[in-house]
Amino acid sequence: ADTDMALAVARARGTGATAIKIYANLDGQTVHRIIEEAHRQDFPVWAHGMLFPGLPADIVAAGPEVISHVCYLGYQLPPRPANYHERTGVDVSLFEAGIPTEITTLFDQMHESGIVLDATARIYAPGPGGDAPGSWRCEGDLAFRLINEAWRRGVMISAGTDGDTAWDHPYPALHEELELLTDRAGLPPMEAIRAATAVAARAVNQEDQMGTIEPGKLANLVFVHDDPLADVSNLRSVAFTVRRGVAYQREDYVPVTEEEMAEIGS
């Protein structure tokens, strides 16, 4: 409460940061003060969907540019953890009859305010990038049901991964995220592609530079052999990529070796 918010935001801008990230333990009033001042200084804000004890409704009402981690929005319904370091699973029994009005109202408000949902589907899926069953996030298909509901209500979905694949994996975690958005969350392939391009550019406040193909934007492109609109996993059939107008052939890609990784780790 004693923080000089104008000075704090100005200092963040002065570091060269591109946005303010809000997470962990903050009350709703403080969240509102941070976002209000950041916007006064024309500085974007990314926030977790729950800021303990700040509720999802508090976060949405405060109006950040991006809200991250779809399952945090489930904490709008009690019971909920007391703080960030004591997170427990969302009570899936509350969603057995459908998505409650308290949650759909949040999605409607996000749509009306133009708030992007950085859904991070990958961390909710069993496997190397996700959590074990029964952990503190979402069990079963709840995360994917929430993503689908948000998308159907017009919320912009961004393809954030909140993690990476193993060092020896031939493609980054983004591909897993896109496949989960289509295969589990039910988004059409084109919507998943938009989540990784146009919406992602908006999420990081770079839509004037990238995200769509049009004059004046950076020539950052990927060319694939197979049709990703038929199956988004076809994005793995990379022929070549273009970064700032320079082409890089996939056939020239040299995977990192275990020895190189060991050297980096040391």
What positions do the PLM features span?
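Short, acidic/polar
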Residues: A1-R11, M50-A57
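Catalytic domains of carbohydrate-active enzymes, especially glycoside hydrolases
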Residues: R11-A19
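Conserved, mostly hydrophobic/aromatic
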Residues: G16, A38, M110, L117, ...
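Active-site core of metal-dependent hydrolases
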Residues: A19-D141, T165, V204, H225
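His/Asp/Glu-enriched, well-ordered alpha-helical/loop segment
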Residues: G134-H225, A247
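C-terminal cap of metal-dependent C-N hydrolases
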Residues: A198, P215-M261
